[in-house]
Regions:
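Hydrophobic faces of well-ordered beta-strands that scaffold small-molecule active sites
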Residues: 2-6, 37-39, 75-79, 103-105, ...
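C-terminal regulatory/interaction regions
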Residues: 173, 177-182, 246-249, 275-290
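Short acidic/histidine-rich active-site segments
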Residues: 233-249
Length: 290
């Protein structure tokens, strides 16, 4: 089971502060059942100006610490990119999640629709697949999904409980259909954002935060999460864990075990056909990182 979104790397953003904090978080994630964890610090211009190489190196170091502690977790490097007016500065050197083509991203609290859409277009143009974090917590994405109605239903995918129970390959089927789509229209070439009425690329996936279903972010987000879940908007599930002390509230085993939708999303591995990425490492990078 893979956690696609954590802030487990120490002293890089608003997540873990020390290595001890990171190890405590890792132990909680392993106890919950995760076997692989994506290390995804924020990438925000002027706040967290991180480079892919910094994240790779930090991931390697923490992996060594976990191995020494006997914590059975596979760490994948990644970033959580902010889709704002500065995102284009990072788009030339994007860091996907491990050996997938998934690029984790989020919208600002006061999102400019044009910049968000332009950011999604840039990710797709670079050959990656946007994985949007916690749309239930973001007004822009929540309202867009509601406006579109049955999100995945519009693409001909059956996300009803019966279908999920009968077919354990429904997610892979979704991905195959998704990538058979024709290429979207290219973004504008000037430095202005796309017009707010432009449609986002169809090759956009969404992950839910497990804590959204447990009430960690409050009742409004909890309602939003269940509403999007009913619409079939989500492809994957993540903890978005920032600190060890919140693990008890976020990683609620009963909530996870008793909900077939959440269970199914947790089985998504992000390495289905057409998502795999050929990893080419230069000198100084280690294959063991992946």
């Amino acid at each position: 089971m893979i956690d696609f979104h954590t802030h487990i790397l120490p002293a890089l953003d608003d997540g873990a502060i020390t290595v001890d904090d990171s190890i405590a978080m890792a132990k909680s994630l392993a106890a919950f059942g995760y076997t692989s964890v994506c290390c995804t610090p924020h990438c925000i211009k002027g706040y967290y100006d991180l480079t892919p190489q910094q994240v790779r190196e930090a991931t390697l170091m923490l992996q060594a610490d976990l191995d020494n502690e006997g914590v059975q977790l596979d760490l994948w490097p990644g970033m959580e990119y902010m889709l704002d007016e500065y995102f284009r500065e990072f788009a030339e050197d994007l860091l996907p999640l491990g050996n997938t083509k998934l690029v984790l991203c989020e919208a600002p609290p006061q999102a400019h629709p044009g910049f968000v859409q332009e950011g999604l277009e840039l990710i797709v143009e670079k050959g990656f697949v946007p994985l949007v974090a916690h749309p239930e917590r973001t007004t822009y994405f929540f309202e867009r999904i509601l406006a579109r109605g049955q999100c995945n239903g519009e693409r001909g995918i059956d996300f009803t409980p019966t279908a999920l129970h009968e077919s354990r390959t429904s997610i892979q089927g979704f991905l195959k259909k998704l990538f058979k789509r024709k290429n979207h229209k290219p973004r504008t070439t000037n430095h202005e954002p796309l017009h707010p009425s432009s449609n986002e690329p169809e090759s956009v996936l969404y992950h839910a935060n497990l804590g959204s279903f447990t009430g960690f972010y409050g009742p409004k987000v909890q309602r939003n999460a269940y509403e999007l879940l009913k619409l079939g908007a989500y492809t994957a599930l993540a903890s978005d864990l920032h600190e060890s002390r919140s693990a008890a509230v976020v990683l609620v085993q009963d909530k996870f075990e008793n909900n077939p939708f959440l269970k199914k999303m947790a089985e998504f591995d992000g390495i289905a056909p057409k998502i795999q990425k050929d990893i080419k490492l230069g000198e100084g990078e280690q294959i063991g990182l992946f």
